[in-house]
Design a protein with these regions (language model features):
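Gly/Pro-enriched, hydrophobic low-complexity segments
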Residues: 74-172
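Short hydrophobic/aromatic-rich beta-strand segments that constitute the beta-sheet cores
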Residues: 2-6, 24-27, 67, 83, ...
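Short, functionally important structural connectors and interaction interfaces within domains
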Residues: 10, 55-57, 156
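Short, surface-exposed beta-strand-loop junctions and turns on beta-sheet-rich folds
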Residues: 9-12, 31-33, 119, 150
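Flexible, processing/modification-adjacent segments and terminal tails
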Residues: 17-93, 120-123, 130, 164, ...
Length: 175
């Protein structure tokens, strides 16, 4: 299960949720919740396997990991790692789902993640996510700052295995 809650201009809401079978998200224009189609549900099931990291138990997830080489990113020497995950389905066709991570060779944490955009007006272009401000949470390290050319996100906290009401994941009928 997975849910994203946001605070948008002082209004707290569940932006999207996935209960293990069905996913939904809010329409960015109307802010109304909309159920996703079966293709999006299948993709969500695959994407949920990536949490908290595609590297954690990657073999059991069916992912492959390959060292591509070393590269310098903004003056930092990194290991470039290719991760091949479950395919994404778009318009009934499976498409490769590959990410590249750049791990700092001193601290062994990813500082950049690159992925190809699969749909929309930017389809085929690469999005580069910069990961920083790593903090330890229950023995795992999480980047509390993530930024790309499109958006920046600062996280206040990561809570692992919290008690969560199952209603959080349910599509809000009639709202």
């Amino acid at each position: 299960k997975q849910a994203t809650k946001i605070d948008l201009q002082g209004q707290k809401m569940t932006w999207s949720a996935y209960d293990g079978e069905t996913s939904w998200t809010r329409n960015q224009m109307t802010m109304e919740p909309e159920k996703n189609d079966s293709e999006a549900n299948k993709n969500m099931k695959n994407i949920a396997k990536e949490w908290p990291s595609p590297f954690l138990n990657y073999k059991e997830k069916g992912f492959t990991v390959e060292l591509v080489g070393k590269e310098t990113i903004d003056g930092t020497e990194t290991f470039k790692i290719k991760v091949t995950k479950d395919p994404i389905v778009r318009d009934g066709q499976e498409q490769p789902n590959i990410s590249h991570y750049y791990f700092d060779t001193e601290n062994f944490v990813p500082i950049v993640q690159e992925e190809e955009i699969k749909e929309g007006p930017m389809k085929g272009q690469t999005v580069k996510m910069t990961l920083s401000d790593y903090q330890e949470v229950n023995g795992l390290y999480f980047p509390f700052s993530q930024s790309s050319q499109f958006q920046s996100m600062e996280f206040k906290e990561f809570v692992l295995n919290p008690e969560v009401e199952s209603a959080l994941f349910v599509f809000p009928e009639g709202k």
